[in-house]
């Protein structure tokens, strides 16, 4: 499908869903990343009131400042042709209040108070969930729908935080590979500094998606589209086999993120419950 037609289809689909929902606005977290930039660019083109929420850890941390600058560059670019309201909410004070209660700690200590391990993913997940809480609080105030920013490669393997960035009302990019998101970004005039930046969730300092996943998005796309009936796995090279196994294992392990929780069902037998 041509990118211009795809763009029109997504925008019309978003408009239709919004009208059916009887809501009044879009609420979206603007991170400075490419998926967020594309989702925001699509939302404003629906001509439905859009609120872009920038939620850095702080306004003094160097890594956060880079993301903030990208986010505001995007918002300033969008404002040249479209309407969007912006709000900045640093989340560091909220995180610190959690950590004072022993929640969301990255540094783990033994009973004798000696250092045990460093688990940045724990604090990273907390950051993501705090941001989701903020977005839904604002959505409540403005009668809005929270726009998801996940793409197919991330969502299919469960590379998102349950109750965090995975908690949304509409997913305009979730059936699009990352490679297609990049094409949309070019078509939608997303700033080049965002397009050229290494993909990162920004959940801890110097984090990149490829480093955390151990594979690139192109490799994930290949694995998701791989058809055993066309090329048997035994004919793949060791590296390809490893990527394929890794992607399939992530899908298996994160299956609980991709569906509703299982529900115990009462059965009826001879007019009664069993």
Ranges and model annotations:
Residues 1-156:
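ATP-dependent adenylation/nucleotidyltransferase module used to activate substrates
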Residues 1-30, 34, 38-42, 46, ...:
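Peripheral terminal appendages
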Residues 40, 69, 136, 179-182, ...:
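Predominant activation on well-ordered alpha-helical scaffold segments within soluble catalytic domains
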Residues 48-50, 71-76, 108-111, 167-172, ...:
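Short, structured secondary-structure boundary patches
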Residues 63-66, 88-96, 130, 180-189, ...:
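Low-complexity, flexible helical/coil segments
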Residues 75, 101, 163, 188, ...:
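Alpha-helix boundary/capping residues
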Residues 76-86, 115, 120, 173-182, ...:
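Short, basic, helix/turn surface patches
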Residues 118-131, 144-216:
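Catalytic subdomain that performs nucleotidyl-dependent activation
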């Amino acid at each position: 499908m041509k990118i211009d037609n795809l763009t029109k289809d997504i925008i019309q689909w978003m408009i239709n869903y919004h009208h059916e929902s009887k809501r009044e606005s879009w609420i979206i977290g603007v991170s400075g990343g490419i998926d967020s930039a594309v989702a925001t660019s699509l939302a404003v083109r629906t001509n439905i009131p859009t609120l872009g929420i920038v939620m850095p850890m702080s306004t003094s941390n160097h890594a956060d400042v880079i993301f903030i600058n990208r986010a505001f560059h995007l918002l300033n670019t969008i404002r040249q042709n479209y309407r969007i309201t912006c709000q900045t909410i640093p989340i560091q004070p909220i995180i610190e209040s959690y950590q004072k209660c022993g929640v969301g700690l990255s540094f783990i200590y033994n009973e004798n108070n000696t250092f045990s391990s460093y688990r940045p993913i724990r604090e990273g997940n907390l950051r993501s969930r705090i941001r989701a809480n903020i977005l839904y609080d604002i959505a409540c105030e403005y009668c809005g729908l929270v726009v998801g920013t996940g793409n197919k490669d991330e969502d299919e393997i469960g590379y998102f935080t349950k109750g965090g960035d995975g908690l949304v009302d509409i997913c305009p990019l979730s059936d699009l590979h990352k490679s297609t998101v990049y094409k949309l970004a070019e078509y939608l005039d997303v700033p080049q500094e965002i397009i050229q930046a290494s993909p990162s969730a920004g959940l801890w300092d110097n984090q990149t998606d490829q480093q955390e996943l151990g594979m690139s998005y192109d490799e994930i796309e290949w694995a998701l589209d791989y058809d055993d009936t066309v090329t048997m796995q035994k004919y793949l090279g060791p590296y390809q086999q490893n990527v394929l196994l890794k992607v399939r294992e992530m899908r298996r392990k994160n299956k609980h993120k991709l569906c509703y929780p299982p529900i115990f069902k009462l059965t009826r037998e001879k007019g009664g419950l069993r």
